[in-house]
Amino acid sequence: MAIQTSNLGYPRIGLQREWKKTLEAFWSNKINEEQFLTTMKEIRLQHVKVQQEKGIELIPIGDFTYYDHVLDTAYMLGFIPSRFSEFTSYLDVYFAMARGSKDHVASEMTKWFNTNYHYIVPEYEEGLQISLKDNRPLRLYEEAKQELGVDGKPVILGPYTFLKLAKGYTQEQFATILKQLVAPYVQLLSELHAAGAQIIQVDEPIFASLTKEEVQQAKEIYEAIRKEVPNATLLLQTYFDSVEENYEEIITFPVSSIGLDFVHGKEGNLNAISKYGFPADKTLAVGCIDGRNIWRADLDEVLTLFTTLQKQVQTKDLIVQPSCSLLHTPIDKTEETHLSTELFDALAFANQKLEELVLIHSALTQGTESISNELETYRNVHHTIRSSAARNREDVKAARTALKEEDFSRPLPFEKRYELQQVALKLPLLPTTTIGSFPQTTEVRQTRKEWRNGIISNEQYEQFIEKETEKWIRYQEEIGLDVLVHGEFERTDMVEYFGERLAGFSFTKNGWVQSYGSRCVKPPVIYGDVAFINGMTIKETVYAQSLTEKVVKGMLTGPVTILNWSFVRNDIPRKEVSYQIALALRHEIELLESSGIRVIQVDEPALREGMPLKEKDWDAYITWAVQSFLLATSSVANETQIHTHMCYSNFEDIVDAIRALDADVISIETSRSHGEFIDTLKHTTYEKGIGLGVYDIHSPRVPSKDEMYEIVEQSLQVCDPKYFWINPDCGLKTRRTEEVIPALEHMVQAAKDARSLLKTNA
């Protein structure tokens, strides 16, 4: 039996975020197109070289992108919206689709399955000519071969997942469009095979959650492709969960290899193999290293997995690989020497995970004695972190044990609370507000950097933050907003900020991962029990409230979002970690309330993304996610108004969960998803406070008052004006001041026009 090492995808951003910096330099015209393409090629080849040097045999090619791999596929297949037809060059069209332009909105952006990565949603339009517009995988395959002598493994997004992720067609059209994808995929695969590609990875993560009918439909497409490209060696790759429900059919697909996730789908995939076996004429690609977390693998557990598989699987070959692309992990832990030894030793970033694959390969091909020293080291590391004081706090355990049913609910129902809040807050009809953050200018970032480096004192930094806060309180008053925010100038990141102030968290210096486009985040590491230490937002919020007679809302990140946007310890259930965070936030919310803050927003933008892929697993997740939010927010008085915020999700799946949060007001992204949630509300009722975002803050364009008014008008057809709020889609941290002020002025004017119309029609 031949055993090979493989990788599914490598982080794009570069060890020092060179990729991000190159993109942003190009967008701001600091480098020209030639410089951009040259630098990107250098980064791309360096990533291939690293994997080659680590000993990976099947190196992914084509996983590198200038923005997003789904967008790459859309462009490659000609899924280019007609509104971008005025652009002629590849990069102009590509980035207009991703980011919008002065006159045109960008394509929608949403979460990649249940991760914190965002992809650009492909758009289908009537009359679209689907064809292979650009065989990018072929170019990159030949580049790696010529420049580095690497015969790589081209990686492409499969036709079924691609079309399932796209929008703009009816369900009745799906089968017809799917068949139209056969020809370009045949051409793509034929050209790769002709160029010498030994194996081609076709990603179909959607296979984890298909119906029987959909799997049959997908199989027919693969049979049509195989008929035209009989000799190409295809690896059908699944990840993020098991394919247990459809395994029996999937193993009959006309492909040479099948990749399964034995981390996030371990139980289901093992059950399926035990029941149905695995074809002797196919190669099994075993996703055995967690591609979504940062902890060292349990090598004993992984080797036990292979022992089990080798007893049950009569395959000719095995491939050792991560559970999914390493896109979701930082690149290398070597710079994180500031961390405690017990934590540093327990980590494995992308490069360390590649080394783990090689270790496992050695154990499988040469025997476990060949890695006996490494096995002993790994066992000691796991024992040390499991038994650490940080993971065994008695006070945290006692607080969890003491929870009672009444800790998870507000005293009065929403309608009665809202009446009391209206009396207390005295807000107009259709109140206006923002989501929380204001522009983090170069000056803000530079001043924070100087403070962190000890160049300026704590007092100087606090004075600067107060100056920025007062400036934006005045801007908000002049614009005419009804509920103000302090602006969050003291925060780098909405999760990192809280993690730095809670027990149980640690932070990397260079643990960046891509969120969307050039936007990178540095997730906190939850390595121990989470507990409240001191007030985290009191000082800045109370100061902002002291500057104005208007209501200022406190701003917190919710427990489920902190959980889902962190790298989380894997020794206890995620539910328990979420409850620990909720208890800490509950303390903070009580402090805000006792300090006179009457509106408190607890953001949960990541609630939806944490949902399991399989519908049968949704209820369990939603139950503890909602309970976590309620645990954090339910101890306040009825007169205190709790807000929450969500963005970029498939909301129709969680309308009931949103309702169960029992927030007094929820603000939701609407504009970039082109009114999708408004459509959802046409088929259901939402009887609590709600603000549907009236403009897309991820695009630099300033929308007109009329555009926003149109969204307000559409929203009021499905929402009760008594409970309706007007706000942007998300926080304004990434926008420039000259974009923010006119956009908010237009928004306030749209609100005034809507109020006038409502009064006229009353």
UniProtKB/Swiss-Prot annotation:
A single BP term in Gene Ontology: methylation
Gene Ontology molecular function, alphabetical: 5-methyltetrahydropteroyltriglutamate-homocysteine S-methyltransferase activity; zinc ion binding
Free-text comment on the cofactor: Binds 1 zinc ion per subunit.
A Pfam family hit: Meth_synt_1
Known pathway: Amino-acid biosynthesis; L-methionine biosynthesis via de novo pathway; L-methionine from L-homocysteine (MetE route): step 1/1
EC top class named in words: transferase
Binding site residues for L-methionine: I435, G436, S437, E488, D603
Residues annotated to bind Zn(2+): H645, C647, E669, C730
Key words, A-Z: Amino-acid biosynthesis, Metal-binding, Methionine biosynthesis, Methyltransferase, Repeat, Transferase, Zinc
Residues reported to bind L-homocysteine: I435, G436, S437, E488, D603
EC number, UniProt record: 2.1.1.14
Residues where 5-methyltetrahydropteroyltri-L-glutamate binds: R17, E18, W19, K20, K111, R519, C520, W565, E609
Coiled coil ranges: none
Active site: H698 (proton donor)
UniProt catalytic activity: 5-methyltetrahydropteroyltri-L-glutamate + L-homocysteine = tetrahydropteroyltri-L-glutamate + L-methionine
Cofactor: Zn(2+)
Keyword Metal-binding: yes
Family per similarity comment: Belongs to the vitamin-B12 independent methionine synthase family.
Function in brief: Catalyzes the transfer of a methyl group from 5-methyltetrahydrofolate to homocysteine resulting in methionine formation.
Protein name (record): 5-methyltetrahydropteroyltriglutamate--homocysteine methyltransferase
Protein's organism: Bacillus thuringiensis (strain Al Hakam)
Gene name of the encoded protein: metE
